[in-house]
Amino acid sequence: AWEYADKLLIVSVMVAGDSVIEQFTPYKDGVITSRKTFQKYYAQSEFRSFVETTLGDDAIAAGQGIFIVFKDKVEEQQFLLQRQHVKRDWNQKTQRELKTRAASTEALKKNIVDKHLDLFTDFWETALDLGRIPANNEFEFSDQIRRVAGSHNKAHQVLLSHFGDGLFKEAQKKRKEDLLVYFALGLFEKRKPKTQMPESLKRDIKAFYNSYNDALEEAKVALFAVGDPELIEKACNKAHDILQCGEMLEGHSYIFHKDYLGDIPPELRIYIGCATQLYGDLE
């Protein structure tokens, strides 16, 4: 299967703990079930080791008993990067910013935006999603926006005048947190430094860090920090204050819905991400 695979291979098995396996009759490296059939159960770590040893490559946990192995390492990075790219809804905040700044926006710039509102809104939301000005191939209507505004940079400046820079600065902060989590989890997985990477990641590094090495150094500090129980406890309290939901058990745990994962402090995202890499996604 690995020889035939072009970009990736997904491998899955049945996973069970000792409490389940003990219910059956041991037989060689598996068990005999109540239906008198042979079944081999794996522990998550055992299966990862088997896959990586057999294929001689890194395996990424996608769930309990499910691992993905990438032949295409650029695709692998793109997959891992997308895992940490939180899709945030900027629309409500954009509308709020628009109302507060409508009166102060320069008439000429306001006229341009109002005349092509859907186009500029799409561009603005793309910029907020990326936390930076999108490259030409990162915005679906690049040709149209460049015809109207001259360039992506000029369109962005018009929109900053229209909406203000507060929301964009917030988007930059959030996107850099996504990248910090991505790089920290890459270090946790002990993945080798990449000689090839997606073009979008190269742009991210250029926009948010001085260099790739700077990104790794910052991620290393963040990764080691999550080994401090006091820091995690403070992060849980902060997350509870931010989300205003979930179950906080003082000195023990904080339980919240995984849909809010992108809204919690980055150190807590890294902490959870380490567990996810070991045991699979939070499904």
Q: Which residues are covered by each model-predicted region?
A:
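Class I S-adenosyl-L-methionine-dependent methyltransferase catalytic core
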Residues: 2-3, 21-24, 49
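A short glycine-rich, Lys/Arg-flanked "PGG" loop and its adjoining helix->strand segment in the class I
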Residues: 1-9
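Functional cation/ligand-contacting sites centered on basic and imidazole/sulfhydryl donors
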Residues: 49, 75-77, 81-283
